[in-house]
Amino acid sequence: MRLSHLFVASTAYLHGVLATTQLPLADETLMINGVTFETRARWMRLANQALGELSGSPCPFAAFGTVIVNHTASDEGELICMGVNENGKTGNPSSHGEIAAITNCTNILTDPNGKFRLTATEVAAAFTDLSLYTNAESCPMCASAIRWAGFREYIYGTSIARLIEKGWGQIRIPSVDIFEASFDLPYPSRLMANVLANETDPYFLWQYDPSYPCPLGCSRTKSGKSCKAGSS
């Protein structure tokens, strides 16, 4: 794809329209790399569940959850690590769910007393066997980190376009543009979009719409402006 086409794609995205010059993506319900949609749905649901496990609430405002899985061990996959957006916890603006998960995986894989005990060189190679599931499309920073790591697969639920439509401030560069521009990197990554978006979307639709129901296990605060764990 020529640079002019990349520019047209990005410009069209600014107006909330996916450009026709972008390459088509595979149907998310297909069996890709020997992994069924049912299996992918299970891992995407775990990315949602990571919110409650790691953030302490099933309805954090920044409800971005990630799991990293090894499908080369078995088609069903082996969980390596999880991560959630930690901006509010750490104050670090780069602590997005994907970055937190990659950091957690690196620590787990190199832990000298852990299961894997890999060297730094071995970890770099290990990422090429792993799949990253995130319940919302990665920002350009995280999509770039995914490509630098060389993940075998990158799977997301809710799209950036959907987030923007529902009030979220986003850098309007879709992951497919990052992937198209990263062909010089040594390891290819397969991108799968909109997996289980019908279940990931509700985690991002209540923050700017007081009339939208809170996620399961949460209820509106008295002001109606936010959601909290438990019943009202």
PLM ranges: what are they?
Residues A63-T72:
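Short beta-strand scaffold segments in enzyme catalytic cores
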Residues P93-C142:
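Short HxH-centered metal-ligating active-site micro-motif
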